[in-house]
């Protein structure tokens, strides 16, 4: 291998490693939404799940420990 090809290969490898370490930073990479982000974006107060499902979740206390029911049964769980 010629030194130029080897140098290009090494520089590309360094670039890949650096960019892989920057995901989710100020560059707007692959940042996953947190529960707080979803709550901020969800302004309407309604239940996405069926009425019976939300009532069962409230009766079993799932509104307090389950993020799934907390986000999808807002009205029944009394979160808005």
From Swiss-Prot:
Its main location: secreted. GO terms for cellular component: extracellular region; nematocyst. One of its GO terms (molecular function) is potassium channel regulator activity. The keyword Secreted applies. Residues 21-38 form a propeptide. Keywords: Disulfide bond, Ion channel impairing toxin, Nematocyst, Neurotoxin, Potassium channel impairing toxin, Secreted, Signal, Toxin, Voltage-gated potassium channel impairing toxin. Disulfide bonds join 45-80, 54-73, 63-77. Residues 45-80 form the ShKT domain. It comes from the Eukaryota. It is found in: Secreted; Nematocyst. Inhibits voltage-gated potassium channels (Kv1/KCNA). Belongs to the sea anemone type 1 potassium channel toxin family. Type 1b subfamily. This is U-actitoxin-Avd9c. It comes from Anemonia viridis.
């Amino acid at each position: 291998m010629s030194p130029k090809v080897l140098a290009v290969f090494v520089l590309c490898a360094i670039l890949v490693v650096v960019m892989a370490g920057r995901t989710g930073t100020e560059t707007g990479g692959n940042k996953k939404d947190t529960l707080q982000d979803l709550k901020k974006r969800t302004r309407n107060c309604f239940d996405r799940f069926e009425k019976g499902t939300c009532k069962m979740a409230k009766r079993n206390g799932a509104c307090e420990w389950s993020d799934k029911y907390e986000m999808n049964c807002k009205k029944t769980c009394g979160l808005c």
